[in-house]
UniProtKB/Swiss-Prot annotation:
It is found in: Cell inner membrane. It catalyses: 2 Na(+)(in) + 3 H(+)(out) = 2 Na(+)(out) + 3 H(+)(in). The gene is nhaB. Pfam families: NhaB. This is Na(+)/H(+) antiporter NhaB. It comes from Salmonella schwarzengrund (strain CVM19633).
Amino acid sequence: MEISWGRAMWRNFLGQSPDWYKLALLVFLIINPFIFLANPFIAGWLLVAEFIFTLAMALKCYPLLPGGLLAIEAVIIGMTSAAHVREEVAANLEVLLLLMFMVAGIYFMKQLLLFIFTRLLLSIRSKMVLSLAFCVAAAFLSAFLDALTVVAVVISVAVGFYGIYHRVASSRGEENDMLDDSHIDPHYKTVLEQFRGFLRSLMMHAGVGTALGGVMTMVGEPQNLIIAKAAGWHFGDFFLRMSPVTVPVLICGLLTCMLVEKMRWFGYGETLPEKVRDVLQQFDDQSRKKRTRQDKLKLIVQAIIGVWLVTALALHLAEVGLIGLSVIILATALTGVTDEHAIGKAFTESLPFTALLTVFFSIVAVIIDQHLFAPIIQFVLQASEHAQLTLFYLFNGLLSSISDNVFVGTIYINEAKAAMENGAISLKQFELLAVAINTGTNLPSVATPNGQAAFLFLLTSALAPLIRLSYGRMVWMALPYTIVLTLIGLLCVEFTLAPVTEWMTQAGWLATLS
């Protein structure tokens, strides 16, 4: 018997999302116009809370859908205007270009990145050294590339290796289903569990590595570029400005990596079983023998393009997104990727998030039009200049750990710049606040998958169920890093940021907007 029209519509609305989630969104959409008529300020804050809710529930439904519906309604009922949304999008065009072209560009360098991480995994026998190598490699790559892409590459390596061993353990060859353990021989099961623990720890080290490296440069995370643009900083300026906080945090983060591996705390410390290493080594040896001269040349070309990417970013030869576009053109032209559909696959990772970011800017337009953050900013600005840095860092950190750090960073840097333009703070103080905002959005956000897009990507990937990486386990394994990164970042903002920045300015290393 066919279902009713009403039931069919309910099933179509947000698809497989839970009924309670659908109902919650409908309630939001119904009550918002009435609350806006009664009190626009409260309605604005309610909209922000609802939007943060959709971000926190990203595993139930991709936030673009519910967040987009809320944003459309906000424009219709007059909380902001379509013209203001367009202005916000236009002002952040560089960020949209970064997401569209840089992420797609790195997609065509995946072979090189896969080669690097495969060599690391099979060449280094010490688990502590291997974990450190993965963390450092992810940090370095994320400083110049998109963190999502770096995590995607490490996931590809892990899924590939897991599949190879799972096939051997189940003795089912190409018909093997990696999610089905029913055919695993009993003596392989213990080894498989150990291998899962090994992969879980490597993935978490790599994920945190992307946060450690991503905070250091203006292209490491999307919000970095927004903050750099507001402050008028180029690549080198941004790196130097952040270094009083980010360099000590990087060192302490790497020490944490070594400590949790050594002490086997928080689910870390599992080593690669020798049986698994033998299987993977045999597979790699076969793959290397099959590698043709054409394949080797592709790796060399990708490495040269990588050098061009780093050089172009460091010297600011063009806008970041345009450098990414040049990577797409060079990588496809010189490695023989000519099919439109093959090129189109490169954009599948970045475009949903680019669309979501455009929705972010709609909510930012509401925040500006309704002056939602004015009371918070006034409260912070009443404090001493020294205390302002700590408060901005903590407010950003708290929100970023439960919401998306791009959203949070965009809001706070806009408010800080408005305060400077209104004469409430000096240019020098604004530049210090920009560092506090950037580090506040990037470092504490490792606490949950909601804050870091790379963590959320890992949690929703095909790898997570294979290695038994749940939301709770990810939060638990991230906990030591959350504590260390947040506290060291706070101490550096409190004690080293202002004096080191002053020293670099006097030494002539830094320029200002004035």
